[in-house]
């Protein structure tokens, strides 16, 4: 199950520097877990999770395989992208294929790095990109409404639902609000997602600050945090230059560097976790002598669907899930101890998997 977060930003905001750090990190991790494919514009990185190493120690696992997040470097954006200016059409097509948007904003002062608008104003920069995405959505909605006129007149149920959702989105956009602000019911969610509106995607604002401001941010990043809170979006403060330096060091050197800078952890770790949370994801584990592994699922996933993440046949032939809560697995020294203490539960098809569950699936076939 792949989850893609697109990294976007205006020119000279540090987007490429940040992405280079991500891809170097991904390259360094490539030997540690399988299926890590790295293309020029894609970086697949491990999701930091201290729980996995603890499980592996208890289970005496030979290998440790973390959950993964994919970041996609989206072509640079300029004002007018919705009309095809610059690489506008490519930008919009690439963003449509992602699950969320990480919007890099310039929150640093540097006279040697020019800004396309000749000023440093991250909130205004965010508005520039948001406006382009909203204009593109409005154009897309108008075309789609025209294309379904005949089906709507014929009373086609699917077309009628699509028309209603498109008009709700259109009204929000015309009022100056992105599509993600529209309240959609669970029953309508699938049809809504199929519209693939650019502004319906969750947003993470990445405040790129100077190296000496990485620990606490600055006035610019404070404004972005306030804006994100008002929008119900997420934000993270990071120094792309620091991340690029860290990505070239071995783990021990990187930790020393972080200590010197007064940072508890790499900004990329916070960025990856924030992207994970933004997509409403959670982790379950499998642990044994061969491997300890973290698996990614959406919150609210039922046990059979979680089994299907491991292999499609597990979902089809699902019988039950032997479940141990993470804390119980640690407290009782692993599967055998937890089972003896009565902490292993047999859960059926209706079980909603919890974050941190250590699972073993029984299935037919």
Where are these regions (language model features)?
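Glycine-rich, flexible loop/turn motifs
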Residues: 26-34, 41-43, 51-54, 83, ...
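Conserved G1/Walker A P-loop phosphate-binding module
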Residues: 1-114, 142-143, 148
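C-terminal-of-GTPase-core extension/linker across diverse P-loop GTPases
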Residues: 2-8, 13, 19, 147-354, ...
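Generic signal for short, ordered secondary-structure residues
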Residues: 17, 34, 70, 120, ...
């Amino acid at each position: 199950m792949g989850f893609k977060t697109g990294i976007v930003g205006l020119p000279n905001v540090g987007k490429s520097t940040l992405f280079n750090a991500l891809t170097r990190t991904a390259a360094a991790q490539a030997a540690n877990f399988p299926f890590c494919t790295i293309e020029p514009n894609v970086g697949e990185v491990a999701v930091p999770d201290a729980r996995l190493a603890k499980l592996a120690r208890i289970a005496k696992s030979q290998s440790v395989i973390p959950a993964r997040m994919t970041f996609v470097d989206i072509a640079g954006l300029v004002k007018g992208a919705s009309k095809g200016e610059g690489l506008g059409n490519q930008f919009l097509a690439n963003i449509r294929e992602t699950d969320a948007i990480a919007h890099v904003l310039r929150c640093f002062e540097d006279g040697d790095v020019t800004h396309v608008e000749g000023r440093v104003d991250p909130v205004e920069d965010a508005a520039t990109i948001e406006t382009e995405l909203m204009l593109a959505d409005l154009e897309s909605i108008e075309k789609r409404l025209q294309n379904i006129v005949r089906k709507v007149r014929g009373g086609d149920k699917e077309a009628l639902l699509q028309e209603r959702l498109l008009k709700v989105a259109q009204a929000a956009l015309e009022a100056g609000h992105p599509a993600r602000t529209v309240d959609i019911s669970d029953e309508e969610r699938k049809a809504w997602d199929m519209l693939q509106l650019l502004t319906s995607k969750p947003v993470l604002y990445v405040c790129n600050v100077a190296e000496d401001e990485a620990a606490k941010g600055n006035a610019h990043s404070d404004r972005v945090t306030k804006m994100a809170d008002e929008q119900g979006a997420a934000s993270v403060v990071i120094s792309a230059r620091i991340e690029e330096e860290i990505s070239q060091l071995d783990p021990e050197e990187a930790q020393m560097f972080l200590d010197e800078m007064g940072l508890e952890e790499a900004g990329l770790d916070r960025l990856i976790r924030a992207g994970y949370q933004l997509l409403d994801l959670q982790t379950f584990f499998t642990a044994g002598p061969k491997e300890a592994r973290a698996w990614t699922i959406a919150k609210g996933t039922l046990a059979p669907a979680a089994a299907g993440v491991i292999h499609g046949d597990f979902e089809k032939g699902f019988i039950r899930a032997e479940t141990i809560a993470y804390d119980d697995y640690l407290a009782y020294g692993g599967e055998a101890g937890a089972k003896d203490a009565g902490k292993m539960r047999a859960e059926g098809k209706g079980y909603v998997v919890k974050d941190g569950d250590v699972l073993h699936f029984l299935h037919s076939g």
